[in-house]
Amino acid sequence: MFDLSLGITVDPSVRFGKPVIKGTRVPVDTVVARVASGMSIKDVAEEYGITEKDIYNALHYAASN
């Protein structure tokens, strides 16, 4: 398992090694897609049981990689 910056992890045994929010099985690309589709940060956080900070970290990670 790789613990990447910003609370993002990559583990081959979780979601086939896709980057996920640390401590969850929520893929970064899913979070980014929801925000890109117009869903609010608050609604995404509530839907996936993650924090708003997790969402901003996922967006930052996606923009950097």
What are these language model-derived features?
Residues 5-26:
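Short, Lys/Arg-enriched anionic-surface-contact patches
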